[in-house]
Amino acid sequence: MRPSSLTAALFVAALCTACASSSSSSSTVPAASAVLTSSPATTSLAATSPAATSPATSPATSLASANPQTTIALQPEFRADAVGTVTVSGPITSGKGAIVLGAGGFDLSTVGYTQDEYFLSGSASAYTSAAPLTSTGRWTVTPTSPADYTTRIVVRGPKDPATFNGNVAVEWLNVSAGFDNSPDWSYAHVEMIRAGWVWVGVSAQAVGILGGGNSLGAALALKAADPDRYGPLVHPGDSYSYDIFSQAGAAVRTQWQQLLGGLQPRHVVAIGESQSAFRLSTYVDAIAPITNVFDGYLVHSRGAVGAALSQAPLADIPAPDPTLVRTDLGVPVLNVLSETDLLGKGLGYTRARQPDTASVRTWEIPGTAHA
């Protein structure tokens, strides 16, 4: 199997693991036998193992470490009172009539999937911390400076309700190119479609909507690509991205009849790659304990340091170097890392390595690239 295919296969196994692990209040996970090798710092794929060419056959096996028994902590309940209510508009059909976000080189309808776009409007908060953020990830933050916003989400799911497996992956769309991209959909869409997942892409950051300094990508930012369609969108800045993402995930949980076409989710998992993984790292440490929106997190190709909690024009609150994953959430957090993420300039994840726990796992995949 090529490294890129292996990455995709493990990525989907991680998604399945998060859902399987959060399906009950407590579950016991058996040992992984030869599939994974463990060190005090991390759990890595064994490059010489036969299993390295074929992912684990069960989510429980793929999560397990060398410990004979691992107990997943009690999953906390979703706190609707800690998340603002959004107004949903859509499906959106205005403007040029096309959703500005690539789905791949095929027609979703040919595989029994639909795609719709919705606008979410509400009031989001930024976050602040009275104390400097520490490397442990056990941060205490408070909401501040609320601001109105309107963003968009894209929903892809099975047309036939009977094929829906109950799992929803909510992807923090990546804006490194100056416009919205969905790299984790690109990695995992074949297996997601086969298994019956719903995928939701969230425009959480300002650049994807308003554009930025990238001259090549500016024309594909939403407001530039289709001013008539995306004219109503408003983004107050990336300090608000965390709460916007929370509210989008909460809407999937509470307004599924409209957003998911009547498909009721059993598990809602947050995913994100590269810059989005940096954001998710900070989200897990700062915001997740406040809201408990998601049943698990797949943090794909991050570096040693999380994204800033807050930034200009609000107070600058950078993440510490390194930024570890807090271990007290009670839901799975899976770090999936390429070899580039470990050693690449500006990434250096080796500084953020931490021991595996009942809820935190790290998968390092030899021979693979960041993107």
Residue ranges and their predicted role:
Residues Q264-L314:
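Primarily recognizes the serine-hydrolase "nucleophile elbow" in alpha/beta-hydrolase
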Residues A20-S22:
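Bacterial signal peptide processing site
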Residues S24-A66, T70-T71:
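Extracellular mucin-like PTS domains
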Residues S301-H370:
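The feature captures the conserved acid-bearing segment of alpha/beta-hydrolase catalytic domains
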Residues A103-G105, S109-V111, Q115-A126, P146, ...:
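Active-site machinery of serine-nucleophile hydrolases
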Residues I244-P265:
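Conserved acidic catalytic loop of the alpha/beta-hydrolase fold
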Residues L15-A18:
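C-terminal motif of bacterial Sec signal peptides marking the signal peptidase cleavage site
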Residues Q69-Y187, A288:
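Catalytic-loop region of hydrolases
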